[in-house]
Amino acid sequence: MSATVKSNAGNFFEDFRPGQILAHATPQTLTEGDVALYRALTGGRYAQYSSAEFAKAAGLPGLCIDPLHAFHVVFGKTVPDISLNAVANLGYADGRFLRPVMPGDTLRAVSEVIGRKENSTGRTGVVWVRTTGLDQRGEEVLSYVRWVMVNKRDPESPAAETMVPQLPEAVPASELTGYPAMAAWDFAASGSRHVLEDYEIGERINHVDGMTVQEAEHQIATRLYQNTAKVHFDFHGQKASRFGKRLVYGGVVISVARSLAFNGLGNAGQILAINAGTHAGPLFAWDTIYAWSEVLDKAELSQTCGALRLRLVAVKDTDPGAFAWKDSAGRYDPAVLLDFDYWAAIPRAR
């Protein structure tokens, strides 16, 4: 009697082809309960994602889903098809948040393979995908490119044809969309008086506060996004891994660091685009995340709304005021967890 394999072993490097379209399971409806749990797990304090009245006065439709929350949900959909057999998630580029996601919206994800390159060892390769998140109306709410190092099924199989996509260094400010009017911004309620004109290119901001990540918290957060990557959950299996223990999902680092950035960037709560992102080092339970930011650029989007291009650097177990980043050879400091380049909306001076 023959047996049929019904479980999903995930795709290996040989399974990916440029131009391939992957429609991911499972659609997820986001509710106000998701909003509350995300806030509890990340410590988010940005006013437009805390107060429905503030959000509406600022020009948003109401209490929206934090863009990073939507990003993690869309990312989570892709894991069973793209990164179940991944060695590492290497980076992000050309991320665009196109319209607000509201409680009650249902998100699904579709990815296109846009590149691949086998590594010199012959055991792994890098796969580039462009993922689009769509709502229940079929409207695009976000899109981004990421690249992943994936194991080969058979290290002896012939090398695949190389195709490396050309990606923009940053999303141009002229192409930013989805920003609100910010005409009736309540500075007392937002907790900050600082506007676009108060920030200078090259300025560095120490976000001061730290947050220690615990085992239960990071696993609940990762489950919230329906991310099934083995490295975050399988305590027994990870004993034989490179680190010998579970790894915290990189999205936890991004969201916690962004929440810490409230102290210094309290009016820059809405992410408009992701220019680049690198997970420079691993985070484990009981590590403490700190963060600092550098202003890379600024732009005027309307009479009342501007944008800051920011580099957010998350570090672990070290003083963020030391501004750890890279050495003279371009290598990341061992304390650096995340190097995240993004655009955020911010009100302009009245």
Could you say what each language-model-derived stretch is?
Residues A88-R99, I114-G115, Q270-G281, L296:
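A cross-kingdom feature marking solvent-exposed beta-strand/loop segments within repeated
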Residues Y38, Y92, L107-S111, V127-T131, ...:
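Short, structured motif recognition centered on aromatic/hydrophobic residues
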Residues D94-G95, Q136, F187, A276, ...:
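Short linear motifs in intrinsically disordered/low-complexity regions
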Residues S2-L90, L142, K152-I274, G330-D339, ...:
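Hot-dog-fold acyl-thioester-processing enzymes
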Residues P61-I65, F97-M102, E161, A280-A285:
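Short amphipathic alpha-helical patches
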Residues S2-P18, V101-Y179, A183-A184, A285, ...:
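HotDog/MaoC-like acyl-thioester-processing domains
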